[in-house]
């Protein structure tokens, strides 16, 4: 997508000469905007007949185009929005379409499958309509001015289309993560996890510390992710916050594994899961950090019960860990989306 042409201060680069040409031509034809709207829309369908399928009021209609009761209001809406945003472009320094309308336009265009080439069709139809309406006034400079104004509006809509696309991707990713949680954990895996947990849970205090130390042995920089460690000069084993934190993480991981199949999902209280997602997002946790915790977990359990350990048990605990990790990632994704929305809202200039 081409970026809007902008000046250093962020405003749209639409020249005074271009503005004068657009305003002059719009003043000459706006009293005839009703007929011109219909011509404009008819031209779109002449240039690209398949575009008819993109309009809900046309695609399943057997009524002749000129008799369709919804055609005129829609054509007027599109033509007037395009022309009026062009007239105000330089003065406003941006495309002047109400923000809620722009978001709706983006979502609708994305949903109906509008592509870059469709915007080129509307531009061609717009330029031909204006040229035929005021042939004595038409010039290459005027054509370029209207084309630039059209492209600015098109790019503003494309930005909102991308936002709609990203929101759908985020929603689908979260849904997939949530739907898959617990769905791939077999009865055999459950039995292995329960059996091994029953054998080690009474030693969970020591194992928690071993588990946490392994995380820092495998990935020493991970120390910076923990607020009680990153600025501490106290030896690890003397840190008063280490054991409670290690116990909390280890017990949550193991107990959610034991309950995974029966519950059909990760059984961590929803408020805790949201908090985990927010904290992991804030501290910059990445996928590779979850791989570190998995390795540390598997090594800790293997060393705790070597006589019981097997590839099947390793896979069972690995799967249980991944289910918990995915549940946390889903919450991280939600937090990220909320954060991006807040940043965008704050960065938008007030009207």
UniProtKB/Swiss-Prot annotation:
Catalyzed reactions per annotation: Fe(III)-heme b-[protein] + nitric oxide + H2O = Fe(II)-heme b-[protein] + nitrite + 2 H(+)
Subunit annotation: Monomer.
Alphabetized UniProt keyword annotations: Cytoplasm, Heme, Iron, Metal-binding, Nodulation, Nucleus, Oxidoreductase, Oxygen transport, Repeat, Transport
Expression triggers: Accumulates in roots within 12 hours after inoculation with Sinorhizobium medicae ABS7, at very early stage of nodule formation. Triggered in roots by hypoxia; this induction is enhanced by an nitric oxide (NO) source such as nitrate NO(3)(-), ammonium NH(4)(+) and S-nitrosoglutathione (GSNO). Up-regulated by nitric oxide (NO), particularly during nodulation mediated by Sinorhizobium meliloti inoculation.
One GO cellular component, as annotated: nucleus
Co-factor binding details: Binds 2 heme groups per subunit.
Any one Gene Ontology molecular-function term assigned to this protein's record: oxygen carrier activity
Gene3D superfamilies, alphabetized: Globins
GO BP: any one term: response to nitric oxide
InterPro entries xrefs: Globin, Globin-like_sf, Globin/Proto, Leghaemoglobin-like, Leghaemoglobin_Fe_BS
Residue ranges of every copy of the Globin domain listed in the record: 13-162, 184-333
Compartments it resides in: Cytoplasm; Nucleus
Essential cofactor(s): heme b
EC number: 1.7.2.-
Binding residues for heme b 2: 227, 241, 245, 275, 279-280
Protein's job: Phytoglobin that regulates the fine tuning of nitric oxide (NO) concentration in the cytosol in response to sudden changes in O(2) availability, and performs both symbiotic and nonsymbiotic functions. Exhibits NO dioxygenase activity in the presence of O(2) but nitrite reductase (NiR) activity in the absence of O(2) (e.g. during flooding or in waterlogged soil). May not function as an oxygen storage or transport protein.
The protein, known as: Anaerobic nitrite reductase Glb1-2
Residues the entry annotates as binding heme b 1: 56, 70, 74, 104, 108-109
Any Pfam family hit: Globin
């Amino acid at each position: 997508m081409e970026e809007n042409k902008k000046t250093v201060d962020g405003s749209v680069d639409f020249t005074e000469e271009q503005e004068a040409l657009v305003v002059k031509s719009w003043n000459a034809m706006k009293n005839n905007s009703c007929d011109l709207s219909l011509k404009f829309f008819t031209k779109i369908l002449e240039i690209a007949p398949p575009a008819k399928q993109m309009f809900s009021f046309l695609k399943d209609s057997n009524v002749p185009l000129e008799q369709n009761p919804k055609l005129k209001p829609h054509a007027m809406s599109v033509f007037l929005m395009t022309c009026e945003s062009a007239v105000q472009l330089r003065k406003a320094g941006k495309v002047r379409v109400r923000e809620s309308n722009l978001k709706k336009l983006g979502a609708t265009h994305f949903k109906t499958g509008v592509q870059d080439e469709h915007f080129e069709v509307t531009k061609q139809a717009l330029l031909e309509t204006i040229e035929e309406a005021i042939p004595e006034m038409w010039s290459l400079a005027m054509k370029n001015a209207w084309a630039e104004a059209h492209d600015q509006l098109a790019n503003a809509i494309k930005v909102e289309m991308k936002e709609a696309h990203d929101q759908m991707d985020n929603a689908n990713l979260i849904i997939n993560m949530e739907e898959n949680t617990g769905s791939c954990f077999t009865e055999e895996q459950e039995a292995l996890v329960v059996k091994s947990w029953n054998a080690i849970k009474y030693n969970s205090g020591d194992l928690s510390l071993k588990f946490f130390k392994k995380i820092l042995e495998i990935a020493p920089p991970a120390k910076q992710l923990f607020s009680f460690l990153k600025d501490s000069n106290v030896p690890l084993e003397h840190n008063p916050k280490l054991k409670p934190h290690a116990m909390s993480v280890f017990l949550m991981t193991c107990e959610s594994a034991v309950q995974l199949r029966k519950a059909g999902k990760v059984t961590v209280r929803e408020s805790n899961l949201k908090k985990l997602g927010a904290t992991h997002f804030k501290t910059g946790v990445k996928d590779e950090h979850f791989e570190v915790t998995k390795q540390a977990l598997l090594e800790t359990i293997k060393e705790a019960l070597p006589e019981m350990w097997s590839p099947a048990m390793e896979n069972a605990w690995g799967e249980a860990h991944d289910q918990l990790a995915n549940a946390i990632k889903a919450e991280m994704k939600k937090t990220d989306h909320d954060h991006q929305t807040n940043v965008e809202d704050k960065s938008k200039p007030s009207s």
